C-alpha cells in the first residue's frame, strides 16, 4: 500500500499481535492508537472509511464513524462462523457493507441483517493456478531433484516463540529418517535472528545445508516445496492455493487457548479444512503439536503420493472458487455506497 502512495500514520508492526493474553502488554498502546485515529478521522471525515480485517481494532472505530454519518465498509468478515459469533451484532452496527472473501459468508451475514457482498479472496488472484515449482527452485537456488519441506512457523514474535522450536525439532526427527531432506524457511528480516536461534537450539549449526532461510520469500518457498508444515492462519490458505499437501500446527499460551476453544464453533482450525468442511489435511493443536507427531504427519504425505494428489485436486477446486476480480468487485461495492450517500 505504501508503494501505491498510501500514507502510514503508524507502522503496521505496531498492530501485529494475535491472541487474547498476548495482546494485554500492548492493550494501552493499541487503545490509544485507535482513539487518536478516531479523533483524526472525525476531525476530517473521509467520504468513506474501509476497515481491513482486524475486527477487534476496526469495528468500534467503524461504529463511531458511522454514528457521525461516515459511510463504512469492512473488508474481510470476522470469522463469526468459526468462533466470533458475538461479532455479528457489532458488525451490523459498524458496516454499511461487508466485503466477504469466502463465498458462504454473504448469505449467513444477510440472514442477520448485515449487507454483504462476495468479492473473492485476493490471494486467489495473486497466486497462479498452476505454480511453477521448477522456476521457484531455480530462483531460490534449490536443487530440482531434492525433496523440500517448507517450514512456516508464523509471522509474529509470539508465534515464532511457540512454534519455531517445535518445527525445527520436527525437522531434526525427519532428518533422522530421511537424511536427504531439505528444509526451506521463509522469514522476515525482523524475525530472522529469532528463527535462527530456534534452529540452532534444535541442533542446526549456522550454515547447515539441510536448512535454508529465505527473507520475504514465503510464496517462492511454497511454490518450491513438496510438502509444508504451517502455522494455522492465512499461510495455510496460501499453501492450499499453491496446491501443496500440508500439516497444520498451532500452539499458544494456555489461557488464550482456553478462551478460544470455548468460542470455537467448528471442529477445524485451519482454513483449508474449514473451507472444505472436512479434515483434508491434519491439524495438531496445542499439546498435540509435538515434534515427533508433526514429523510423522509430514513424512506420511511423502509416503502417500496418491492421497497427496487427491488433496491437490481439492485445492485446485478451492482456488477456482475463490478466484474473482476482487479489486473490481470491491471498488464497485464502494462506489455504490458513495453514490447512495
Predicted features and spans:
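Nucleotide-activated sugar donor-binding and catalytic core shared by glycosyltransferases
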Residues: 1-341
